[in-house]
From Swiss-Prot:
Classification of source organism: Archaea, Thermoproteota, Thermoprotei, Sulfolobales, Sulfolobaceae
Gene Ontology MF annotations: snoRNA binding
One GO BP annotation of this record: pseudouridine synthesis
Coiled-coil regions, chain positions: none
Name of the protein described by the UniProt record: Ribosome biogenesis protein Nop10
Family: Belongs to the NOP10 family.
Keywords on record: Ribonucleoprotein, Ribosome biogenesis, rRNA processing
Keyword rRNA processing on entry: yes
Entry's Gene Ontology cellular component terms: ribonucleoprotein complex
Classification via Pfam families: Nop10p (PF04135)
Classification via InterPro entries: H/ACA_rnp_Nop10, H/ACA_rnp_Nop10_sf, Nop10_arc-typ
Functional description taken from the UniProt entry: Involved in ribosome biogenesis; more specifically in 18S rRNA pseudouridylation and in cleavage of pre-rRNA.
């Protein structure tokens, strides 16, 4: 599925473009990955998520 809205990780603005029009940073997809109950790597993602502090 192709997402339309994107987010700039530098200044936390939303846009429809691949490059942020304000700062020129490549944008990212702000939606989380799909959840699967049979995911064998969920433990590692939770550990990573707890260790990272987001500033947005």
């Amino acid at each position: 599925m192709k997402w339309k809205i994107k987010k700039c990780p530098k200044d936390c603005t939303y846009t429809l473009k691949d490059i942020c029009p304000i700062c020129g940073t490549p944008t990212i997809i702000p939606h989380p990955a799909r959840f699967s109950p049979v995911d064998k790597y969920v433990k590692y993602r939770i550990e990573i998520k707890k260790g990272i502090k987001l500033n947005c």
